[in-house]
């Protein structure tokens, strides 16, 4: 699992850059089947969402499906935790 903040989000290309607490930047690609969960503000619980619900600056947890040859990762699921 990768934890960090979304520093760049490219919805058109289904990708993002996640910055970990140590400053490490990770390129993340989202498959069509990627599970997205976002905070539901009334209950402060997680609910199903879409890639378009994510925003730069959100703190997220990313489940890695695979690592590409260029070092980027393919995301299995992403959950917004802030």
State where each predicted segment sits.
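Structured surface patches comprising rigid loops and adjacent beta-strands/short helices at the edges
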Residues: 31-39
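Short, flexible, surface-exposed loop segments at domain boundaries
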Residues: 1-27, 39-82
């Amino acid at each position: 699992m990768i934890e960090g903040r979304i520093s760049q989000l490219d919805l058109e290309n289904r990708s993002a850059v996640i910055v970990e607490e140590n400053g490490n930047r990770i390129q993340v690609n989202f498959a069509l089947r990627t599970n997205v969960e976002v905070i539901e503000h009334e209950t402060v619980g997680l609910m199903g969402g879409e890639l378009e619900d994510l925003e730069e600056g959100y703190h997220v947890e990313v489940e890695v499906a695979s690592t590409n040859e260029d070092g980027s990762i393919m995301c299995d699921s992403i959950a917004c935790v802030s």
